[in-house]
Amino acid sequence: MSADLQQGTTNAADFSLTVLRARIALLATAIGGPDYTSQIDPPPYKLGDDCLACLKDLKRWFKLVDDQQKRWDVAMAVAEYRILTDDLLPILIDWENKCSLAAKLAKNNPDHEEFRNKAYYDKIALNCLQLLVLMTWPLIVTEQSSSNQITLYGELKKHQLVYKKTILSMESGKVLRAAIRLALDVIKIDRLSRTPRDNMVLKLVLNFFRNVIAIEPGEFTINTKKSMPKKGITSIDTLPPNVSMDDISLNTVISSFHKNKVFGFLLTLTSSLSKEFDQDFINIPLLEIMFYFTKDVNQELLFPRQFETGTHSKVVNKNESSSANNIVTSAGFELSKLLQKEHQMRKNVIKHTSARHSRFGGLLSIQTPDKTRLTVSGSQALVDEKIALQKLDDSKKWNKRIIKKHQSVAAEGLPNSLLNSQTGKAIFFTESNGKHFKEFINNFIDSGFNILLHSVTNYFTTEQDRMVTLEQVEYLLFFAWFVKYQLLRSKIDNSADIKQVSEALKEVTFILVSSLLRSAYDLKNWTVTHAGMIAFNELLNLVSRTKAAQEEDSTDIEFIVSRLFSDERIQLLSNLPKIGSKYSLQFMKSCIELTHSVLKVLEQYSDDKTLVIEGKSRRQKKFNISEGDITKLIEEENVDRDEALDILTSSLRSIEVNFQKVQANYMTEPVIETYINFLERFRELEDDSIKKVFSFFHRVFVQAKEQALLFRFDLIILLREMLSPDGLDRMSRSRKYVSQFSDYFLARLKKRLKKSPAWFVGLLFPPLHNSEVGFYQRYGEYNVLNNESMYAAPASQFKPIPDEEALPPSILLDMKYGVLVSTLLDDGKTELLDQLLKHITHTLDIFKSWLTVNVNAGKETVNPPNEYFTLTGVLNNDPIFKDKDYRALLLLIGYSIPRKINEPCFLPGTVEVSDLTVSCELVKKYLSTPFETPNGLPSSSYLLRVRSEKDSFSHNEQDGWEGDDDYDYNDPYIVPDDQILSKSDAAYFKDLDNNASDKLKGTKFSKGIARSKKKDKRKRRKGEAKTNLPMFGDQDDERPQTVRERHGVFSKEFISDSEDDEDLMNPIFFENETYMRWLLDKNNGQLTEDRYIQFAKFAAERMNNGGVVTGDYTSLFGGSIPSIESIRATESSSFAPDKSLISLASHVASEMSIFDVNNNNNNQLSDDDVNSESRNSLGSSQPSNSQNMFQSEVYSRKESTKRSLEASAADESDEDEEAIRLFGKKSRVVLSQGDSDD
């Protein structure tokens, strides 16, 4: 039964597809065709009688099927019936010829009239352009694509390549002129007189140009789960018949665009973007056009060879760049690379072939320990054992490197060629086209780059949350490409000024670029992360060049540098190379170049002056703020008192950047792993990349003196391989860097092995960390600690216990011992307690015997000597200095705990034997009997683990506490570990909300002072931030409890707004509120003044008597006082849902379904293009997580809506009408422009 049902469904789908194809065939016939009755050869194109209506019907079919049903059946049928090549292009070219002729005649004869029915033909031309945009829209397949789209993807891609060739070649690309003519009709209109439809026509023309440039051969990989077969497939298999790569290359596009004046049109729009045009309509299409123009172009190849003086690169593309101008086609360039490869292979064959005895073969057999034999042929193996072993290695099966899932760009719905300009597989131009392209780029930078970058930056700043992967990559690579191009241009052209890309240094641009990089890294969107690294690297290069040029206006530079090296950004930049070894060669290259630029810029600034940045300050012990300081700041800055206090006690301060500290962030094993993995592929690298690797190795080995990080076998073998005859070319400029470093590296390694023979074993394993052995291994000396300057940790304190004052001292002491002992037991510190109990028992015996001897001798007042306490075994004495809970227990027993590392811990002889006996018994008790906390939480919930700003062994923080000061545990500036600084008012109110349930249970919280809400200021001082520091004039007992952020652990202590809010938590209070609502409802929301006074007495009496009322309130309630239960029952029934709403909703739903049925029976299709479904075109975000899948759907709908708006808004209409249409379960109002001539 199910098989029959499935077969029936398939037959129905085939029948509907057959009907659809028949409709498209009829439309293709009715549009028009060659006029064979004409005597002209070839016959001219003749329009059909209903040509305009047919074109509009075709647009409706695209929206109805392809957009709304996520199918590409219409696009496939249109391609098979050759509507674009046989109908649309001839119509547009014929229209362009007529308009051009009319313009020439009008120029010679001003009285000449336009050709007949021009308005009608203009409508046809505009509809043809709309269809061209729909049919050439780049196709992208993602995880959300339907099976129909995946099936048709390959064939449609080939059809689009035919479209591109035909558009560029038919009458030398005259259809491009036709599109420009449509745009010129809009440009002639004054800006204030243009309608949104006119602006959409401009956007439509730009999208047509964008589509022509963006069309490329289909990808082999659709996504990580669905792949096209790759065996035996070459780039030719993705091309349709009679189409070569030269026909659709960027070289051909540039030639056609230059001939048809597209470059001039684009320059006109970009240079006048903010003056003559509505930039919100055309800024993104212009960005996309410039992105697709440049994404495959290597900037260095656009400049003369003299730019790289003395360069001998290993990359074949580089070696051939000097002859690029002589290459006419891309096929010729491929041939030159193959010839170069053949020449290199022939040299290697000759080098390893015997000259005189090659005809007499040699055979060498090697027996392995497991009795197997390995055979090597060739007489060379008899001469050199290294060659024999190398031949064995070469005979091993080579496992091709598998690209990880996160490295697949196609899996994110993006074309694989996004980063081609960085791979060396750049496109080459003929000499004339290269000159035209370079001239266009220069003119664009001189006149429009700053304007366009400013426009799109402002747009994306407001829309950043809606930016999808493709938009982020386009923006970042557009930014990076033009900045790098201008830097290269300025080196050889004195007229080129860095100020022509000055918008790249603006504050908003820097914030957007850095935020895109940060968010992409956090979301593990590695494609955007890669693009962000490229853009950030070029930004740093621009900063460095501007600094070297010593520009007068350096405000933007100082702003960038002051924020560039904040702790958070340094952490991000140093994390990027740590993950680089997991990804592609180009990703690692970007990591290395970014690291090189970061260290270079920071070192450049640190050499000139002390680099000061904005960073988080440590909390000071006291703030010396006077009333005069506050008044002066209020007058100077025109701010209120709260904001002045916020500025004076700001938690941000200027700090000096220690270059050595920043450099140390990069001295880690993962970073070294990335550099070595990158260098292993040295045959694919340029000299400049190899030089940067060894520059970093020099930093590690010499400047940072972290030699242990580079003492590795893989690096030793790699250096040997690079310097071997088969390694780097002897003429390579980078070989000398490798040779010099290798000599120094091996010399230091020999010394280290002689000094510390343990390194013979250490080379075999990763270096050790955080231990005395590891320290000695790395630095060759013992890790001697300066005990004089190391302070012990403050002991834990007890939180306030409910009803503490009412408890007897013995019960309170018992609880404290129970809390501390059970906390240590929970942490698995039984051995600490055993040794402590053993010492107490031993001390008791000594004290008792001492007392017995002295009483007999009449010396009762003499105290016994102090008993020193040390831990034995593997524990060392660290817990006595560092364990806060253990130190608290020692303090509770009576021990004198050390404040510094070199001080002893002892039990004074002044301790009473009775007290020590009680302590011993209590420790024994809770070692054997579990302690049950009254609140049901772990014992540690009663402890407050305080710490000072000068915690552990830190010496650089400023908290005002000196080593000779006593601990002041009541000082609010000794901060509890489990408290953090509330980051916003929202977090503060969330904390208060969490307090409510606890306060109903009777939990007590510390009190604080509520400050007024800060006013939201648009312009605040740089470095300003909110703070909870004390206000001026606060007394010691009024200081608010300070909290501190520490590792993202949220606080369990909260601050209340008032000391009197405990009454508000009384259930009687809420019952009184219920009575008040009942009275207001009964009296229509109004009460007399007498009744308000009566109710106040009534509420106060209930609060004082626990809900009991003794007075007479019949006049207030109009009878007896109702019970609270009856009032609540009345309220709950009055709030029940109204059944009439349900019936009304059912009625509306039934009316909507009837309306939909009537619409479906009507065969007339609407010409509205708004709110259509996604066509999965032009990008999608990565489907690796739910957020990105949602983003992909949003962008897909956004792209379809954008494309449809362009088509519908451009429709010419004689009358405008409004239609309301209901779609499915959503009621959407759609404004439709009808055409009177349908």
Curated annotation (Swiss-Prot):
Principal cellular location given in the protein's record: nucleus
Biased amino acid composition, Basic and acidic residues: 1038-1050, 1195-1205
Ranges of compositional bias, category Basic residues: 1010-1023
Region (Disordered): 1008-1051, 1159-1218
GO molecular function: DNA binding
Record's subcellular location: Nucleus
Phosphoserine: modified positions: S626, S654, S1056, S1058, S1213
UniProt xrefs under Pfam families: TIMELESS
GO biological process: DNA repair; DNA replication; DNA replication checkpoint signaling; maintenance of DNA repeat elements; meiotic cell cycle; mitotic sister chromatid cohesion; replication fork arrest; replication fork processing
Function: Forms a fork protection complex (FPC) with CSM3 and which is required for chromosome segregation during meiosis and DNA damage repair. FPC coordinates leading and lagging strand synthesis and moves with the replication fork. FPC stabilizes replication forks in a configuration that is recognized by replication checkpoint sensors and protects stalled replication forks against the fork-releasing activity of RRM3 helicase.
Family: Belongs to the timeless family.
Known partners and oligomeric status: Component of the fork protection complex (FPC) consisting of TOF1 and CSM3. Interacts with WSS1 and ESC4.
UniProt-recorded name of the protein: Topoisomerase 1-associated factor 1
